[in-house]
């Protein structure tokens, strides 16, 4: 019988990743023995792997995060190639966030939401409360000035939030989480990018079959042809993968 409260780690190009077998493993690991873990969750995909290589500050930020997990299918395939016995699966950040929110609602875990447009954030709060009875103890949209950051950190700390989710895009959200933890360290932080937009229906996600086949990237490209430059950039990652430079 597998022990879901622990997880192996795997290294790709110097980055240590948690190897979750599936979503249930991820949830049981984060809520091991009824105690929510504290630290920072960062989703890792091929694009982020490239950014880490190119930007020393981002690499330092992400290396410092306790819980780095495979969000992209390319990363999962690379782990399996380097470690043939690895039982690791993709855990999509958007799905993990929803499951965390559902679990938080069930267990009364307090949540603070940061980021997104004001109207999207308001809709996210309403849906979380209606759908899972999530105890949201505070929120702040993404439109705040740099000089307001410290006051926001103090608000988060005063709220006593056990989970803080930040939708600001990378690396802004990683910088925010790092700095906020100096004021409010006793929480689980999660960078969620555009998840609020998807959750509220403002952005359409790839159909399940595309996700299952590992083709969510292609769906996004077909939906947004302007992403072609970003996708071509990923050829470098494919070279790492197929030459075994992992």
From Swiss-Prot:
Its EC number is 2.4.1.180. One of its GO terms (biological process) is enterobacterial common antigen biosynthetic process. It comes from the Bacteria. Pfam families: Glyco_tran_WecG. Keywords: Glycosyltransferase, Transferase. It catalyses: UDP-N-acetyl-alpha-D-mannosaminouronate + N-acetyl-alpha-D-glucosaminyl-di-trans,octa-cis-undecaprenyl diphosphate = beta-D-ManNAcA-(1->4)-alpha-D-GlcNAc-di-trans,octa-cis-undecaprenyl diphosphate + UDP + H(+). Pathway: Bacterial outer membrane biogenesis; enterobacterial common antigen biosynthesis. One of its GO terms (molecular function) is lipopolysaccharide N-acetylmannosaminouronosyltransferase activity. Catalyzes the synthesis of Und-PP-GlcNAc-ManNAcA (Lipid II), the second lipid-linked intermediate involved in enterobacterial common antigen (ECA) synthesis. Belongs to the glycosyltransferase 26 family. This is UDP-N-acetyl-D-mannosaminuronic acid transferase. It comes from Escherichia coli O157:H7.
